[in-house]
Amino acid sequence: MTLQEQIMKALHVQPVIDPKAEIRKRVDFLKDYVKKTGAKGFVLGISGGQDSTLAGRLAQLAVEEIRNEGGNATFIAVRLPYKVQKDEDDAQLALQFIQADQSVAFDIASTVDAFSNQYENLLGESLTDFNKGNVKARIRMVTQYAIGGQNGLLVIGTDHAAEAVTGFFTKFGDGGADLLPLTGLTKRQGRALLQELGADERLYLKMPTADLLDEKPGQADETELGITYDQLDDYLEGKAVPTDVAEKIEKRYTVSEHKRQVPASMFDDWWK
């Protein structure tokens, strides 16, 4: 088995999917898991990007089905901007599409800036822009878990195969979640699910960005990765990609393994 095949297997990627069937399986997963845990529903941060839009709509479909079947579940969608988000219109469009039971907005700027200032005062140096970006992601995680803990809700994560293979998420930030309904999907497969669900194409054709950096607001994921999502998707779906691209992907996969594991102990061997 080639490394490419090993990665596809580890990340549960199927080269070809039926979007309608995938929606059904993932909604069922959300329903089954929330019932098993005894939780009262879900909470998820909504950015206006493809991934949170898809996960949010799946979550809302799941809780509606639970209620229609005589159960009780709710979904809270959370906007978590840092000051003014340039693509706020997209976030609002996503919320209109998702139709969450409840929506709430938290501007994380005061919390992030207070921490950043305290860090500088105590340690005598400013946070790097990259590290501050990770703080933003982790404050968003803290906010979602506070809402979840207060209301008995599970925190949904938006990680999918194209992010997982590169480790392109903040450890204990957007990587901190209770369940991952998009696992195994490539970026283009996620788009196909949104198309099947009837989303406005603006929500899945827009340039993906983590938008964590003050110095480079709205920087494209592909710019930061040095790899396009089409290349990542081709690789994950078992297609041939240029050798240098495959090497970049495989290197990122190897060095980011710790992000896909629980914290290491001396009894684990995945890190050796």
UniProtKB/Swiss-Prot annotation:
Domain of life: Bacteria
GO cellular component: cytoplasm
Keyword flag Metal-binding: yes
Binding, ATP: 45-52, 158, 187, 209
Keyword flag Nucleotide-binding: yes
Catalytic activity: deamido-NAD(+) + NH4(+) + ATP = AMP + diphosphate + NAD(+) + H(+)
Keywords assigned by UniProt, alphabetized: ATP-binding, Ligase, Magnesium, Metal-binding, NAD, Nucleotide-binding
GO molecular function: ATP binding; glutaminase activity; metal ion binding; NAD+ synthase (glutamine-hydrolyzing) activity; NAD+ synthase activity
SUPFAM superfamilies: Adenine nucleotide alpha hydrolases-like
Record-listed E.C. numbers: 6.3.1.5
Family: Belongs to the NAD synthetase family.
Function description: Catalyzes the ATP-dependent amidation of deamido-NAD to form NAD. Uses ammonia as a nitrogen source.
Protein name: NH(3)-dependent NAD(+) synthetase
